[in-house]
Protein backbone atom coordinates (compact mmCIF):
# COMPACT_ATOMS: atom_id res chain seq x y z
CA UNK A 1 0.00 0.00 0.00
CA UNK A 2 1.21 3.52 -0.81
CA UNK A 3 1.36 6.19 1.85
CA UNK A 4 -1.45 8.71 1.89
CA UNK A 5 -4.01 6.55 0.06
CA UNK A 6 -5.85 5.46 3.18
CA UNK A 7 -6.33 2.02 4.65
CA UNK A 8 -8.95 0.74 2.20
CA UNK A 9 -7.37 1.57 -1.14
CA UNK A 10 -4.36 0.39 -3.08
CA UNK A 11 -2.19 2.09 -5.65
CA UNK A 12 -3.77 -0.04 -8.40
CA UNK A 13 -7.24 1.15 -7.49
CA UNK A 14 -6.30 4.82 -7.35
CA UNK A 15 -3.89 5.20 -10.27
CA UNK A 16 -6.26 4.95 -13.26
CA UNK A 17 -9.04 6.80 -11.46
CA UNK A 18 -6.85 9.74 -10.56
CA UNK A 19 -5.38 9.79 -14.07
CA UNK A 20 -8.84 9.88 -15.65
CA UNK A 21 -9.98 12.65 -13.34
CA UNK A 22 -6.80 14.68 -13.88
CA UNK A 23 -7.05 14.38 -17.67
CA UNK A 24 -10.56 15.81 -17.87
CA UNK A 25 -10.88 18.05 -14.82
CA UNK A 26 -10.27 21.73 -14.40
CA UNK A 27 -7.86 22.79 -11.66
CA UNK A 28 -10.75 23.96 -9.48
CA UNK A 29 -12.71 20.71 -9.75
CA UNK A 30 -9.53 18.70 -9.24
CA UNK A 31 -8.89 20.57 -6.00
CA UNK A 32 -12.34 19.54 -4.75
CA UNK A 33 -11.85 15.90 -5.74
CA UNK A 34 -11.30 13.60 -2.80
CA UNK A 35 -10.99 9.84 -3.20
CA UNK A 36 -11.82 9.24 0.44
CA UNK A 37 -13.72 12.07 2.11
CA UNK A 38 -14.21 9.91 5.20
CA UNK A 39 -10.43 9.64 5.53
CA UNK A 40 -10.02 13.42 5.53
CA UNK A 41 -12.87 13.82 7.99
CA UNK A 42 -11.21 11.28 10.31
CA UNK A 43 -8.02 13.34 10.51
CA UNK A 44 -7.28 15.49 13.56
CA UNK A 45 -8.57 19.03 13.25
CA UNK A 46 -5.05 20.49 13.00
CA UNK A 47 -4.24 18.19 10.05
CA UNK A 48 -7.57 18.96 8.34
CA UNK A 49 -6.77 22.67 8.61
CA UNK A 50 -3.42 22.02 6.95
CA UNK A 51 -5.04 20.02 4.14
CA UNK A 52 -7.71 22.64 3.48
CA UNK A 53 -5.17 25.47 3.67
CA UNK A 54 -2.91 23.66 1.21
CA UNK A 55 -5.87 23.17 -1.16
CA UNK A 56 -6.68 26.87 -0.89
CA UNK A 57 -3.05 27.83 -1.59
CA UNK A 58 -2.97 25.47 -4.58
CA UNK A 59 -6.11 27.09 -5.96
CA UNK A 60 -4.44 30.52 -5.63
CA UNK A 61 -1.38 29.13 -7.45
CA UNK A 62 -3.64 27.90 -10.25
CA UNK A 63 -5.18 31.37 -10.58
CA UNK A 64 -1.72 32.98 -10.73
CA UNK A 65 -0.54 30.44 -13.29
CA UNK A 66 -3.56 31.18 -15.47
CA UNK A 67 -2.78 34.91 -15.25
CA UNK A 68 0.87 34.22 -16.12
CA UNK A 69 -0.12 32.15 -19.15
CA UNK A 70 -2.53 34.85 -20.38
CA UNK A 71 0.16 37.53 -20.08
CA UNK A 72 2.78 35.26 -21.65
CA UNK A 73 0.45 34.65 -24.59
CA UNK A 74 -0.10 38.40 -24.92
CA UNK A 75 3.68 39.02 -25.09
CA UNK A 76 4.06 36.20 -27.64
CA UNK A 77 1.38 37.78 -29.83
CA UNK A 78 3.04 41.20 -29.55
CA UNK A 79 6.43 39.88 -30.61
CA UNK A 80 4.91 37.73 -33.37
CA UNK A 81 3.81 40.95 -35.09
CA UNK A 82 7.30 42.42 -34.63
CA UNK A 83 9.03 39.30 -35.93
CA UNK A 84 6.59 38.86 -38.82
CA UNK A 85 8.24 41.17 -41.35
CA UNK A 86 11.73 39.92 -40.47
CA UNK A 87 10.73 36.30 -40.88
CA UNK A 88 8.98 37.06 -44.16
CA UNK A 89 12.10 38.80 -45.51
CA UNK A 90 14.23 35.83 -44.41
CA UNK A 91 11.81 33.43 -46.14
CA UNK A 92 12.02 35.43 -49.35
CA UNK A 93 15.84 35.45 -49.26
CA UNK A 94 16.15 31.72 -48.56
CA UNK A 95 13.70 30.89 -51.36
CA UNK A 96 15.51 33.21 -53.81
CA UNK A 97 12.45 35.42 -54.12
CA UNK A 98 14.41 38.47 -52.97
CA UNK A 99 18.02 39.45 -53.63
CA UNK A 100 19.57 41.61 -50.90
CA UNK A 101 21.07 44.92 -51.89
CA UNK A 102 24.73 45.74 -51.31
CA UNK A 103 23.77 47.93 -48.34
CA UNK A 104 21.83 45.08 -46.74
CA UNK A 105 24.88 42.79 -47.06
CA UNK A 106 27.21 45.17 -45.24
CA UNK A 107 27.65 44.75 -41.51
Curated annotation (Swiss-Prot):
GO BP, sorted A to Z = nucleosome assembly
Task: Extract the coiled-coil ranges from the record.
Answer: none
Q: Name one GO cellular component term.
A: nucleus
Q: Looking at the Swiss-Prot or TrEMBL record, what is one Pfam family this protein matches? A: NAP
Family statement: Belongs to the nucleosome assembly protein (NAP) family.
What protein am I looking at? Putative nucleosome assembly protein 1-like 6
Amino acid sequence: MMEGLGEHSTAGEMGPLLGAVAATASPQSLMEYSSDADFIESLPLVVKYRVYTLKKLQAKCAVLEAKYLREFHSVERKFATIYGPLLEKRRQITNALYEPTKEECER
